[in-house]
């Protein structure tokens, strides 16, 4: 299969499919239809079939999809066989929560290094993760060859910290700050604005009738 770029919306749905397929496997279910998958993950079946079509013939008409085969396929696509080390930059309230969580449900992702300006927690180990002073950011990123970072620092330093992280070799940033950071073209940023998401949810609750 030749590698091709798929739509971003499709790429964001792949981990959702993969996680539910693992639930089916644990329940000893051997196959699933696009309709069943649709009901479980709340994505319409036509979209699921279109998403899967980007990767060729993954199912059979009248049979559906083989659960184990799909898991093996998406495991490869999502690099689930490879451990990805992640840097946590900023160990405040949100950072601490992420540090304690540390993606225990996902065996292929882990926070392996954290950074903070607070001298009382720098050079300590919390939840099994070493916390380095922010002055060591670039050096440690380079030495540990970490390419993915979670950014949970105050907005007023977000850009400068981002610049240091990129200089240290980071290619992907999960940005929890309200600031829309600027990065080179070869660096990918995913923005997670919890306030914005909550305000959007409230808007839909107030302006859209769920019974319609």
Curated annotation (Swiss-Prot):
Residues 16-55 bind DNA. Its main location: cytoplasm. Homodimer. GO terms for biological process: negative regulation of DNA-templated transcription; response to redox state. It is found in: Cytoplasm. This is Redox-sensing transcriptional repressor Rex. Coiled coil: none annotated. Belongs to the transcriptional regulatory Rex family. The lineage of its organism: Bacteria, Bacillati, Bacillota, Bacilli, Lactobacillales. SUPFAM superfamilies: NAD(P)-binding Rossmann-fold domains (SSF51735), Winged helix' DNA-binding domain (SSF46785). The keyword Transcription regulation applies.
